[in-house]
Amino acid sequence: MYYSNKMSKVITGKQYSWSELAKHNTENDCWVAVDGKVYDITRWVPLHPGGKEVLLLAAGRDVTNLFESYHPMSDKPTSILKNYEIGYISSYEHPKFVQKSDFYKTLKERVRKHFKATDQDPQMAVSIFSRLALVYLLVFVTYYLAHYTSNNFYLNCFLAIVYALCNSLFSMHMMHDSCHAAISHYPGVWKWMGASFDFVTGASFLSWCHQHVIGHHIYTNVRNADPDLGQGEVDFRIVTPFQTRSWYHKYQHIYAPLLYGIYTLKYRTQDWEAFVKDGKNGAIRVSVATNFDKAAYVIGKLSFVFFRFILPLRYHSFTDLICYFLIAEFVFGWYLTINFQVSHVAEDLKFFATPERPDEPSQINEDWAILQLKTTQDYGHGSLLCTFFSGSLNHQVVHHLFPSIAQDFYPQLVPIVKEVCKEHNITYHIKPNFTEAIMSHINYLYKMGNDPDYVKKPLASKDD
C-alpha cells in the first residue's frame, strides 16, 4: 500500500520499483508502466498493430507520455491496456510529470476532428512516399556523383558538400519519420527503412531511437534525462544552470556552433558504447538488441567502411579521399546538429534540472504537453523550402506533441495548436525564419557563457 501523489489517496496492490520493472525488457517478458500502473504486455507483443519493435523499445520503462503521444487518434489502446494490469509502480528511474491539464486532451480532440473532417490518414498520403522517394534518390545519386564521376579536386570538394546535405535530408526525412513510426501502418516499412539508415550512414538506427524517442522526446530539456543536453558538470558548452561555468564558456557562442560539425563522431560511436560498453545512451538504458538489430548494426558498419573508403579508393588517392570524407562529415554533422539545436536551445525556452541521480528522482510539477511548448520553438512557417530542408523541424512544436503523425500534415495542425494554446494562455514560440532561429540559439549561448545573472535564473517551474 502507498499514497498516490496524483490522486492523493491510498492505493492498494502489488508494487514494483523501477529497477524491478527494468528487468522485464524482452520479447518474452515485456512490462511497461503507464500512469502509475504496471502492465505485463508480453502476450500483446506479437499482436500489436504497430509491430513488436516499438514495444520492445518501451519495454521495462515508464512510458506514460510515450503512450499518450503515440495514440492521439483513438482511445482504444487505453481500453486494451487495462487487460494487462498487474500492479503499481512505486519508484521512478527518471523525473515524472505530475500535472495533467485539459490542454492536451482538448488538443487531441481537435486534431482527431480535423483528420475526420478532411478524410485524411495521418500516416498515409501520396506526398509522404513521393517525398521519401526523392530523398532516397538524392542520397544515392549524390553519393555516386561525389565518389565516381570526377578527378577534379575542387569539384569533388563541392560534391562532398552536396552529398552531405542530401545525407542530412535522408536522416531528417526518412530516418526521423521511421523512428517515430510515422510512415504507413505497416511496421515492416519503418523497420526496413530504419535498417537502410544503418546501411547509408553507418550509424545505428536503434541507438538513435533510444536517444531521440525514449530520451529527448519524453524528457525534452530535462537535464540528466534528455540525452541531447550535456550530462557532465564540465562540458564544452554550458546550457543549463547546474553546469559548472569555465573561462572558455565565455566564447562558446563562437566555437560551439563550429564544433557541431564533429557531431558525426558521436553519432557513429555512441552506438558502440550503448550496445557493447555500458548499455546506456546518456541517461537512457538501451534495450536488448534483437538479432535483426544486431545484423543491421554490423552490416551498417561494414557497408559504411566499404562504400565510403574501400570502393572509392579505386578512383581517388587516399589523401584526397580523406579530405572529401572530412568535408562531407563536417557538413553532415553541422547541418543535423544546428537544425535540432535551434529548436530547443534558444532564448525564451525553458530548461528543467534534476538532482544528480538520487534514488527517487525529482517530480516535474508540470504537464508534459505544456512542457513541450515551453522547451520548443518553431521557425519559418509558410516556407516550403524551409520545411523541406529542415525535414519539417521548423514545425517542431507540432512534431513533439504528435510524433507519430507524418510531417506532411504539420502545417495543417499549426493553426489548431495555436488556437488551443491561446485558449489556455500558453505561449507558442516561433521565429519568422531560420536565420533568426540560429541567432536566438547563438544569443542564448552567449548569455549562458557571459551573463552571471542569466545562468543563475531559477529553474523552470509550473508558474513560469
From Swiss-Prot:
GO terms for molecular function: acyl-CoA (8-3)-desaturase activity; metal ion binding; oxidoreductase activity; oxidoreductase activity, acting on paired donors, with oxidation of a pair of donors resulting in the reduction of molecular oxygen to two molecules of water. PROSITE patterns: CYTOCHROME_B5_2. CDD domains: Delta6-FADS-like. It comes from the Eukaryota. InterPro entries: Cyt_B5-like_heme/steroid-bd, Cyt_B5-like_heme/steroid_sf, FA_desaturase_dom, Fatty_acid_desaturase. A motif (Histidine box-1) lies at residues 176-180. It is found in: Membrane. It is an enzyme of class 1 (oxidoreductase). Coiled coil: none annotated. Its EC number is 1.14.19.-. Residues 13-90 form the Cytochrome b5 heme-binding domain. A motif (Histidine box-2) lies at residues 212-217. The chain crosses the membrane at residues 125-145, 153-173, 318-338. GO terms for biological process: fatty acid metabolic process; lipid metabolic process; response to heat; unsaturated fatty acid biosynthetic process. It holds the Pfam family Cyt-b5. GO terms for cellular component: plasma membrane. Belongs to the fatty acid desaturase type 1 family. The histidine box domains may contain the active site and/or be involved in metal ion binding. Specific for desaturation of the 5 position in C16 and C18 fatty acids. This is Delta(5) fatty acid desaturase A. It comes from Dictyostelium discoideum (Social amoeba). The gene is fadA.
